[in-house]
Amino acid sequence: MDTRFNGGVIMDVTTKEQAIIAEEAGAVAVMALERIPADIRAAGGVSRMSDPKLIKEIMSAVKIPVMAKVRIGHFVEAEILQAIGIDFIDESEVLSPADSVHHVNKRDFSTPFVCGARNLGEALRRISEGAKMIRTKGEAGTGDVVQAVSHMRQIIKEINLVKALREDELYVMAKDLQVPYDLVKYVHDNGRLPVPNFSAGGVATPADAALMRRLGADGVFVGSGIFKSGDPKKRAKAIVEAVKNYNNPEIIAKVSEDLGEAMVGINENEIKIIMAERGV
């Protein structure tokens, strides 16, 4: 299991200047994008992989690992990112899907992949395809953490259900989830996914980030919540501290002070496009 990012924050950035802010704030990695999820959602239309030139500029600006997104099922975009030396590929529902049925066969790549999931079945199917990290889908670009909470609770609930099964019941569960038996057996024996399980989608405050850690996330992705806020530098540092000290309300309270205005956000009831429904 690749645990190098565990206990850390991965931040969306659109420029090398933002990447430097993220690195200085203590981010364990950055996600290079042309537009953060809030702007992708606002613009509508078809969203695709970012310009490789932009990604390479961000890669050259920081020493921490750089990730980038590809459309679901678009293995050529993934090949491009691998060719330029990206550290991690996110097969992401935030971009417009290229294939409504198939995901990328991640086992064909030497570069590791992270994928989104709303439940245990989605998580294990992505892992069976070769994903090395799972994140909750949440609802990116909203600043509303409710879906990330829902997805994390669902995954943890289903993990606990599998833990309670008898050995002979695991085969039925594997069939129901449409995943290999050995993955279900791992969850049963270890009480967790066989890869890191991060949270993403709607995290906007230090308290949000700490909440996701308390619910069982190994780490946190933060997208629009930092660079759509009033004081990105201070908020980025505060979220990193909250993730490190997620069990300490006093520290979280201190770092939450005077952060400037948080991103305005979109209530889940106002959302027209549900990105989390892409790619099951």
Curated annotation (Swiss-Prot):
It catalyses: aldehydo-D-ribose 5-phosphate + D-glyceraldehyde 3-phosphate + L-glutamine = pyridoxal 5'-phosphate + L-glutamate + phosphate + 3 H2O + H(+). The keyword Lyase applies. It comes from the Bacteria. GO terms for molecular function: amine-lyase activity; pyridoxal 5'-phosphate synthase (glutamine hydrolysing) activity. Disulfide bonds: none annotated. Pathway: Cofactor biosynthesis; pyridoxal 5'-phosphate biosynthesis. InterPro entries: Aldolase_TIM, PdxS/SNZ, PdxS/SNZ_N, RibuloseP-bd_barrel. One of its GO terms (biological process) is amino acid metabolic process. PROSITE patterns: PDXS_SNZ_1, PDXS_SNZ_2. The active site is at residue 69. D-ribose 5-phosphate binds at residues 12, 141, 202, 223-224. The keyword rRNA-binding does not apply. Its EC number is 4.3.3.6. D-glyceraldehyde 3-phosphate binds at residue 153. Keywords: Lyase, Pyridoxal phosphate, Schiff base. Catalyzes the formation of pyridoxal 5'-phosphate from ribose 5-phosphate (RBP), glyceraldehyde 3-phosphate (G3P) and ammonia. The ammonia is provided by the PdxT subunit. Can also use ribulose 5-phosphate and dihydroxyacetone phosphate as substrates, resulting from enzyme-catalyzed isomerization of RBP and G3P, respectively. In the presence of PdxT, forms a dodecamer of heterodimers. Belongs to the PdxS/SNZ family. This is Pyridoxal 5'-phosphate synthase subunit PdxS.
